[in-house]
């Protein structure tokens, strides 16, 4: 899980 702030993948 990527930390909120680094939009590497669109979280839906």
From Swiss-Prot:
Domain of life of the source: Eukaryota
GO cellular component terms given for this protein: extracellular space
Tissue spec. comment: Hemolymph.
Transmembrane segments: none
Function: Does not function as a hemocyanin.
Assembly mode: Hexamer.
Record-stated family: Belongs to the tyrosinase family. Hemocyanin subfamily.
Name of the featured protein: Pseudohemocyanin
Organism: Liocarcinus marmoreus
Lineage, uppermost ranks: Eukaryota, Metazoa, Ecdysozoa, Arthropoda, Crustacea
């Amino acid at each position: 899980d990527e930390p909120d702030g680094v939009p590497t993948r669109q979280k839906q």
